[in-house]
Amino acid sequence: MTLLRGDDFFTSRAVTVAVEPRTPQTAFPEHYHDFWEIVLVEQGAGVHVFNDQPYALCSGSVFFVRDNDRHLFEDVEGLCLTNMLYRSPRGFRFLSDIAAFLPYGPNGEWQGQWQVNAAGMQQLKQSLNSLAELAQSDAPEAIAASESLFLHILVQLRQQCFQTQSSGSERQGVQALLGWLQNNYSEEVNWGSLADRFSLPLRTLHRQLKQHTGMTPQRYLNRLRLLEARRRLQQSDDSITTIAHACGFSDSNHFSTQFRKAFSQAPKSLRHQAFSREE
């Protein structure tokens, strides 16, 4: 597995933050870093496999990555993102500790996937552009300014993340819906009921989901289900039928057909490959 080193990305060893735009982000094999980063998706689609857990990417996706995390990008389609790099939560010169602004849950668990709305992403992009300029200098005043702006961006992210949980505008409702689908893809979904739940007209729901994900709502839902099914086929001993039902497919034959369409491979073939690698 590839180790990405901070010396290849930070302007100098004195600099504590860096900005790396990827426009586009191509498929990239599994890797890890000796630094921490925050990944902000501006547009496009793809799959982010984070510590063996797949996530479907869309505009507004945000991932917090630690130095001991493994991740990769695959199945990318017009994916554009920006990486905000930092040495570590305690690796700053003028900030003492940023742990309070990182995605730790109430019991200390890491909750590294967030979603922000389009307006919030636009504000963040402006701040990232300014940060990219500051991060080019290792003068003490530039480092202090860059760390201050980095903290400001963290605060922006935290505020925008909470905003997506409220009813607010249509865009905020869609972002909250995307988060709900990511965590509840295995449930039986009635789009009309979901539209009511997130205070969205049904036609708006379809239009906005297509705009954010590049897919129809049902295709996006199937994508989430298939990604989880692929993970379970590779990592568990459960039967194909059990996995299909656990991931929201009521018919295992239909699941196999959809799986072959998505991955050009039958579920049985993938499982055989996974078991062969372990032997």
Swiss-Prot record:
GO terms for biological process: positive regulation of DNA-templated transcription; rhamnose metabolic process. The keyword Transcription applies. The record marks D251 as: Interaction with sigma-70. Residues 192-213, 240-263 bind DNA. Pfam families: AraC_binding, HTH_18. Residues 175-273 form the HTH araC/xylS-type domain. SMART domains: HTH_ARAC. NCBIfam families: PRK13503.1 (NF010028). Activates expression of the rhaBAD and rhaT operons. This is HTH-type transcriptional activator RhaS. The gene is rhaS.
